[in-house]
Each structure stands twice: as structure tokens, then as C-alpha cells.
């Protein structure tokens, strides 16, 4: 189909009657795809089985699959949240969960392994997001758990018993923290930088008794200014 086209016809049966929609065409480029195209975590469907999973990359030009990290090399622990900087594999971060876990930051051909948790963090470095400059990477620190419902209408509830947000300076190896992002009575989570890097977005919820009050938890979408030159946050959320 290289350089050709595909015509798609769509029909639907609604209230016992068939309807035909307008055909549309997919044009196939004559130019080959670049060598690499997509990375992903591959895990069996289910809620609790993670003994065999890995982070993989697929060559979209021929559909070949290659392993980046396989958890057989990490004593079967869970691998998650692999995040390149704007799809650039030269800057790459991922997290290994568990008692022997760590967070790996790759840049300039070197890898830095960070302790997964300590007293200053209060939880594991879980959900990352790169600053567009590549100088910083924002993380949430989460104490994540899951519970199963006994009713038929719901199956599983994944929840945090604590979570904060901070920024890591990958050049100086320093943490940028602020009490506005680590409240004792609030849970901050999933930080994201704006495209210009001047704002960091995140979600925040009031602390509740989990899992008993899981229905009461409501997250707000918040933002705070960020100065990449000084590595400081604004004074207002």
C-alpha cells in the first residue's frame, strides 16, 4: 500500500435499521517511517500480577520489538512511569518499585540511580514530568495502595495514603521543595510543566481516611509559577 490509498466504508445498525455513512480515504505515504517510533510498558492484564513485565520499544518501520528494561533483571519488581523528555531518549527517567527500588535518570549517556525514598521525600518518586529545558524533572512522591471491592459494581480502588510534589535539578542533583506542594493535610500529585516551563500544574485533594472515605476524595487542578533560572516556585497556588 506504499504511496496508495485505503477507502473505508462504515455501516451501523441503529434501532434495527442499517445506516451507511460517507466513505473516507486514508492516504499511505510513500516515505518510510523513521527507525524508532514508540516505547511502552508491557504487562499482562490484571490487577496484581507484575512478575513478568518490562519497558519495550518498537521499530515502527518494521514492527520489531526490543526490550529496554525487563523486570527479570530487577528481581521481578514492578517497573513504571518511563518518561523521556519530549520523546527524546537522551533524557529518560523510570522508577523501580519495591524495597530495593530506585529512580533512574539517564542523560548525556550516563545513568544516575536515586534512592527510591527517604525521610525527606516521605514516599517513592513515582510520577515524573520533564521541564522543557531538560534541567529539571518534577516528581510526585506517593504511598500507593490498592483495595478490592466486594460488590459487583466496582472491582478495584487504587489510592494514596500520602503524596507530595517536588522538582529535581538533574544538573546540581538537588531537590526543589516548597511547603505549598507538601501540605500535611493535602495530597499533591501528578505534576506537569507548561510548554514554556514557567508554570507547573498538579492536582491536590484534602486528606481523607482511606479507603473508608474513598468516595469523598475530590481533586482540584492547581498551578504554581516556576522560575527555571533560579529554581524557585511562586508564592501562591
What is each stretch, according to the model?
Residues 61-77, 106-124, 167-187, 225-237:
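Multi-bladed beta-propeller domains
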Residues 78-80, 124-126, 161, 187-189, ...:
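Beta-rich catalytic cores
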Residues 86-88, 132-133, 195-196:
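Residue-level detector of Asp-centered blade-edge/turn motifs that repeat once per structural unit
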Residues 91-92, 134-137, 200:
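Hydrophobic beta-strand positions that form the internal "hydrophobic ladder"
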